[in-house]
């Protein structure tokens, strides 16, 4: 069973610091920008049509003649849902009448687009009204429903308004009737509804939604495989090309969920499924699910994860491949996949308080997720490469997906609103509550109101710097549990100036401060931010003979703009010293640049030569990976040869 739960998103109030600044960016720039994009009001940006699709569905429901066509991906509704969820979290912490009016307008539109029986999906209402529930493999009906359920729960939890919750309860009841009462076989080709049903269950207290989630989990991967049978009989395809065989790895349906041990197939689908499995394991005490989650966690994070917290090695199926296949230039590492990995990590933390889950959460958040958005909040990466060479990246047939710069939007725009909803709800990832214990997973400035009868405020510039100061408000005999990152070689913790022995109070990556707290008590932590070299196991062929550099949870990279335009000729000296430069508030939003001693070889004109290249000593300048691509198109590398 669960040993903790996330705090409600409204329990955290942002203060000053690194992540609160990102929350402000999402609130002031990202959410308004994305609303304009969803309304097709942004010039020079890929057309969305997502809200217009819902307007067309509403008109059809009113019996009006609709000559316009549905536009976009079959899952276009989910872009609206994720934007709604991000807006909901923002409204809960920062009331904004204009934004609330926009949100309520979208909710009214969803109500008009919903059919009398609760069915809600603009693609099928507008384009394929006679083919509902006939293509679960491809058509994302349940996926879109899941995202809208999450938005509904978020809006209810953040504002207390239940208008969207009522709409999505009606939709969930429609799905329940279809799959439980009418005994329709099947489950979603793209997992998402499962984790959403667990949220809906907790928001409403209705057991039927948990029951429906369990049904979908239990049905997945059973023989005969549902997708194989559906594919043979349905007679139509979303993407226009019919395949006689079904990639069951891609749809996460090769094996029943309790028998899964290796992460395979589409990376986002995988971690969304694992999130639901871990959630259900915690709610029901299902040891089979819990054991599967442990095996899958190890498969992902010990053998198939990039140093940046990216997952999914290939563009072919946006998928995992095999253990230790982690190419840097042809990588996929979708932003949504790292977000899903954070979802999975949070659920695993609720099963057991182990620092390795939080370490991965940090790795994914501070590198790939933040790197998935331009510093101005208006451009986004779908794919997150670890090596970029303009002229090859985004151009060569094998690297069309690895772009050297972030576009302002995508035809398939799942990632931009996903980043927004994660960052706007980050407080519920930062803190968890157990029995008389408040867990501090992530360090961010602000204050959290605990249901245990006290509040805790935090002052920190983490992860730029390695100090965090917590002040206790109230009087309570309780336990505060602080994450101790594995990368910190020397961590100190003091209470009211008196240092505690971590050997006595720390376990599995958490330091437990158990005492009778008084108003104004101060807990201070200091982490060792000394930058260091990282080496991959020799099982990873792409990184053989190479080194990466990390400071705190942030991986660094070399960009051409800092290194004479060429990082391909650089290598790090084996005994080279890494040096921290002073914090530069004016550079890339405020960073601590690094330099490392190394070498540069001078390129020759010949493609191949007997002559050994000449080399000269250089200082290689490094910046945090999440900041790359913000200064124009240029080369970038995370892993550099070591000589």
Q: How would you describe each model-predicted region?
A:
Residues 2-4, 58-80, 131-144, 177-190, ...:
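Solvent-exposed loop and edge beta-strand segments that line ligand/cofactor-binding
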Residues 11, 213, 293, 359-367, ...:
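C-terminal beta-rich recognition modules with glycine/proline-rich loops and embedded aromatic residues
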Residues 19, 84-97, 146-161, 194-206, ...:
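Well-ordered alpha-helical scaffold segments within catalytic/enzyme domains
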Residues 56-75, 81, 85, 90-188, ...:
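Extended ligand-binding groove/face enriched in aromatic
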Residues 282-303, 328-378:
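Catalytic-core region of carbohydrate-active enzymes that cleave or remodel glycosidic bonds
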Residues 471, 476-485:
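Surface-exposed beta-strand/loop patches in extracellular or lumenal glycoproteins
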Residues 488-514, 533-539:
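Solvent-exposed beta-strand/loop surfaces of large extracellular or lumenal domains
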């Amino acid at each position: 069973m669960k040993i903790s739960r996330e705090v409600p998103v409204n329990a955290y109030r942002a203060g000053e610091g690194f992540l609160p600044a990102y929350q402000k960016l999402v609130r002031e720039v990202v959410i308004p920008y994305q609303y304009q994009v969803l309304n097709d009001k942004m010039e020079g940006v890929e057309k969305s049509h997502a809200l217009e699709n819902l307007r067309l569905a509403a008109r059809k429901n009113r019996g009006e003649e609709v000559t316009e066509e549905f536009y976009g991906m079959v899952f276009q509704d989910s872009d609206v849902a994720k934007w709604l969820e991000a807006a909901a979290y923002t409204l809960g912490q920062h009331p904004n009448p204009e934004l609330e009016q926009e949100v309520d307008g979208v909710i009214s539109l969803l109500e008009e687009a919903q059919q009398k029986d609760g069915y809600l999906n603009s693609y099928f209402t507008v384009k394929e009204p006679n083919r509902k529930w006939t293509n679960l493999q491809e058509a994302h009906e349940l996926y879109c429903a899941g995202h809208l359920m999450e938005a509904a729960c978020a809006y209810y939890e953040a504002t207390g308004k239940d208008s969207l919750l009522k709409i999505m309860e009606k939709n969930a009841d429609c799905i329940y009737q279809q799959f439980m009462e009418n005994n329709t076989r099947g489950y979603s080709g793209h997992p998402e509804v499962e984790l959403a049903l667990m949220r809906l269950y907790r928001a409403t207290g209705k057991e039927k939604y948990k029951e429906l989630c369990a049904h979908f989990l239990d049905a997945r991967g059973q023989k005969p495989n549902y997708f194989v049978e559906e594919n043979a009989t349905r007679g139509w395809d979303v993407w226009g090309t019919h395949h006689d065989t079904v990639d069951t790895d891609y749809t996460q349906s090769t094996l029943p969920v309790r028998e899964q041990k290796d992460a395979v197939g589409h990376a986002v689908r995988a971690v969304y499924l694992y999130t639901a499995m871990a959630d259900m394991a915690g709610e029901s005490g299902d040891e089979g699910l819990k054991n599967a989650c442990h095996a899958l966690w190890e498969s992902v994070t010990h053998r198939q994860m990039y140093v940046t917290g990216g997952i999914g090695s290939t563009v072919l199926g946006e998928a995992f491949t095999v253990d230790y296949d982690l190419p840097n230039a042809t990588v996929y590492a979708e932003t949504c996949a790292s977000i899903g990995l954070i979802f999975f990590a949070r659920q695993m933390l609720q099963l057991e308080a182990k620092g390795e889950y939080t370490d991965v959460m940090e790795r994914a958040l501070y590198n790939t997720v933040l790197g998935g958005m331009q510093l101005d909040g208006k451009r986004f990466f779908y794919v997150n490469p670890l090596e970029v060479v303009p002229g090859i990246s985004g151009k060569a047939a094998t690297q069309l997906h690895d772009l050297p710069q972030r576009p302002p939007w995508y035809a398939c725009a799942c990632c931009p609103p996903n980043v927004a909803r994660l960052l706007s709800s980050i407080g519920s990832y930062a803190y968890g509550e157990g029995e008389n214990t408040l867990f501090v997973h992530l360090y961010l400035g602000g204050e959290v109101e605990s249901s245990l009868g006290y509040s805790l405020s935090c002052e920190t510039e983490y992860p730029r710097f390695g100090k965090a100061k917590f002040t206790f408000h109230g009087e309570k005999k309780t336990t505060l549990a602080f994450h101790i990152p594995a990368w910190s070689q020397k961590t100190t913790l003091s209470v009211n100036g008196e240092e505690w022995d971590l050997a006595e109070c720390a376990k599995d990556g958490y330091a437990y401060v158990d005492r009778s707290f008084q108003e104004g008590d101060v807990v201070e932590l200091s982490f060792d931010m000394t930058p260091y070299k990282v080496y991959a196991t020799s099982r990873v062929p792409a990184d053989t003979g190479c080194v990466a550099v990390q400071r705190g949870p942030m991986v660094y990279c070399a960009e051409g703009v800092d290194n004479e335009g060429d990082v391909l000729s650089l290598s790090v000296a084996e005994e080279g010293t890494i040096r921290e430069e002073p914090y530069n508030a004016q550079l890339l939003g405020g960073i601590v640049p690094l330099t490392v001693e190394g070498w540069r070889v001078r390129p020759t004109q010949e493609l191949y030569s007997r002559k050994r290249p000449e080399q000269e000593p250089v200082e290689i300048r490094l910046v945090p990976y999440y900041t790359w691509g913000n200064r124009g198109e240029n080369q970038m590398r995370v892993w550099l040869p070591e000589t």
